[in-house]
Regions:
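Catalytic cores and adjacent binding grooves of peptidoglycan-active enzymes
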Residues: 94-179
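Extended, low-complexity, intrinsically disordered C-terminal regulatory tails
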Residues: 58-91
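Generic structural signal for short, solvent-exposed loop/turn connectors between secondary structure elements
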Residues: 49-50, 67-71, 110-113
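A short linear-motif detector with a strong N-terminal bias
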Residues: 52-55, 83-89, 127-131
């Protein structure tokens, strides 16, 4: 089962999402360039029984993929608390509370530090173009020898002290869950 959370916070079926987003209905598509048959999405469906997709994130991913001009490798999408704990135990830089756990994050791997930096720069423009606030995580992963970029559209009240890219935020958002 695929559930899409709209930007208004409403949960809708894949079929309703496809109709709203102009994707062929009854297909495996969750975006113009992404489908449930892709490795990571299929794995999340198998692991959790449900694939949860955030409208803002998929619109961002689609536009970024369109501008990038070649496929993007999704290496992390949804995560359970158990999966997050496994990553921490294994020594990965994994937050206690991650936007991946609330279906608002994606890690895209380019296979190259240089291309990841280029993708992150392109993402800034895409987010601005779409009017979507996005957080970008890159440098700490590059320093650790990774080649992926973390993107999330998680509201700042979930992420104390981690503002959206280039955006200030109200002080009251600092009373939040730490991750």
């Amino acid at each position: 089962m695929v559930i899409v959370t709209t930007k208004e916070g409403k949960e809708i079926s894949l079929k309703d999402w496809q109709k709203k987003y102009g994707i062929p209905e009854n297909s495996t598509k969750i975006g113009k360039f992404f489908s449930t048959t892709e490795r990571k999405f299929a794995q999340d469906l198998a692991d959790y029984g449900t694939l949860r997709v955030n409208e803002q994130l998929i619109r961002f991913m689609d536009r970024l993929r369109e501008k990038w001009g070649k496929p993007l490798n999704v290496n992390s999408f949804n995560r359970s608390p158990e999966k997050q704990a496994q990553l921490q135990t294994a020594g990965y830089r994994a937050a206690q509370f991650s936007p991946h756990m609330v279906y608002m994050a994606v890690d895209l791997d380019t296979g190259s530090a240089l291309e990841s930096r280029q993708l992150a720069m392109m993402a800034e423009g895409v987010a601005k173009e779409l009017g979507i606030k996005i957080r970008i995580g890159l440098e700490e992963y590059i320093k650790a020898g990774q080649t992926f970029v973390h993107f999330d559209c998680c509201p700042e009240y979930y992420a104390k002290g981690k503002p959206f890219h280039g955006q200030s935020h109200p002080a009251q958002w600092e009373n939040s869950i730490e991750w």
